């Protein structure tokens, strides 16, 4: 076999990685959380992908559209330091740690990594009715405790995030379990909810068939 043939075979076996694609094993918890909305996995989240992500989770069209506009317009510039304005409002997943807001739980550190002690603090401080779950009222009290009166944007963002989370992931008793809250931080809950919704839709279609 000639050297040229070996070289060609080597190239065929080692395709170049897709531009912007991230190595999931090396991603921080926050990057994994954000990457759920990177529907084509190119390392960038556009407004229509944010919309598609929220629709996949089961939100209505109007809410998904509003959230997509709010998130991408608000975070795009922060995740693209040194780059010019883009009317497409892209969010760079690898720089998602640059858009963390105040008035939150501090479960992510400055680099977007998961902080176990801060996570445990949520339930140690605020889970009064059940040690491993939060009621809607307890979530409201937690948000009030974390709120910085001079950080309106951060408080509104945190309120919206927890409101949507509770709506999508609460159990039949209206409780948000510790397991679900933990899974939201690395985005694994998103995948679980999408899979569950997809399965329900498939069963519904089968039942409608004559």
UniProtKB/Swiss-Prot annotation:
<dbReference type="InterPro" id="IPR007736">
    <property type="entry name" value="Caleosin-related"/>
</dbReference>
<keyword id="KW-0408">Iron</keyword>
<dbReference type="InterPro" id="IPR011992">
    <property type="entry name" value="EF-hand-dom_pair"/>
</dbReference>
<dbReference type="GO" id="GO:1990137">
    <property type="term" value="F:plant seed peroxygenase activity"/>
</dbReference>
<dbReference type="GO" id="GO:0046872">
    <property type="term" value="F:metal ion binding"/>
</dbReference>
<feature type="short sequence motif" description="Proline-knot">
    <location>
        <begin position="81"/>
        <end position="90"/>
    </location>
</feature>
<keyword id="KW-0349">Heme</keyword>
<feature type="region of interest" description="Disordered">
    <location>
        <begin position="1"/>
        <end position="24"/>
    </location>
</feature>
<feature type="binding site">
    <location>
        <position position="40"/>
    </location>
    <ligand>
        <name>Ca(2+)</name>
    </ligand>
</feature>
<dbReference type="GO" id="GO:0005576">
    <property type="term" value="C:extracellular region"/>
</dbReference>
<protein>
    <recommendedName>
        <fullName>Probable peroxygenase 7</fullName>
        <ecNumber>1.11.2.3</ecNumber>
    </recommendedName>
</protein>
<comment type="similarity">
    <text>Belongs to the caleosin family.</text>
</comment>
<dbReference type="Pfam" id="PF05042">
    <property type="entry name" value="Caleosin"/>
</dbReference>
<feature type="binding site">
    <location>
        <position position="42"/>
    </location>
    <ligand>
        <name>Ca(2+)</name>
    </ligand>
</feature>
<keyword id="KW-0964">Secreted</keyword>
<keyword id="KW-0597">Phosphoprotein</keyword>
<dbReference type="GO" id="GO:0016298">
    <property type="term" value="F:lipase activity"/>
</dbReference>
<feature type="binding site">
    <location>
        <position position="44"/>
    </location>
    <ligand>
        <name>Ca(2+)</name>
    </ligand>
</feature>
<feature type="binding site">
    <location>
        <position position="49"/>
    </location>
    <ligand>
        <name>Ca(2+)</name>
    </ligand>
</feature>
<comment type="function">
    <text>Probable calcium-binding peroxygenase. May be involved in pollination.</text>
</comment>
<feature type="binding site" description="axial binding residue">
    <location>
        <position position="33"/>
    </location>
    <ligand>
        <name>heme</name>
    </ligand>
</feature>
<feature type="modified residue" description="Phosphoserine">
    <location>
        <position position="188"/>
    </location>
</feature>
<comment type="subunit">
    <text>Homodimer.</text>
</comment>
<feature type="domain" description="EF-hand">
    <location>
        <begin position="25"/>
        <end position="60"/>
    </location>
</feature>
<keyword id="KW-0560">Oxidoreductase</keyword>
<keyword id="KW-0479">Metal-binding</keyword>
<keyword id="KW-0106">Calcium</keyword>
<feature type="binding site">
    <location>
        <position position="38"/>
    </location>
    <ligand>
        <name>Ca(2+)</name>
    </ligand>
</feature>
């Amino acid at each position: 076999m000639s050297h040229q043939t070996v070289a060609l075979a080597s190239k065929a076996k080692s395709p170049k990685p897709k531009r912007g694609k991230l190595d999931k094993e090396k991603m921080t918890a926050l990057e994994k959380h954000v990457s759920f909305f990177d529907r084509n996995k190119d390392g960038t989240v556009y407004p229509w992908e944010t919309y598609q992500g929220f629709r996949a989770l089961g939100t209505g069209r109007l809410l998904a559209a509003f959230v997509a506009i709010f998130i991408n317009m608000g975070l795009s510039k922060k995740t693209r330091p040194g780059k010019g304005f883009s009317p497409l409002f892209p969010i760079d997943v690898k720089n998602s740690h640059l858009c963390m807001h105040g008035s939150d739980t501090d479960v992510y550190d400055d680099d977007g990594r998961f902080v176990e002690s801060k996570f445990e603090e949520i339930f140690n401080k605020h889970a009064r009715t059940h040690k491993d779950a939060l009621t809607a009222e307890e979530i409201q009290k937690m948000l009030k405790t974390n709120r910085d009166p001079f950080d309106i944007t951060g408080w509104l963002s945190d309120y919206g995030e927890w409101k949507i989370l509770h709506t999508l992931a609460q159990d039949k008793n209206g409780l948000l379990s510790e397991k679900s809250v933990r899974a939201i931080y690395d985005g694994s809950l998103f995948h679980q909810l999408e899979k569950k919704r997809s399965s329900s839709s498939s069963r519904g279609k089968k039942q409608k068939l004559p």
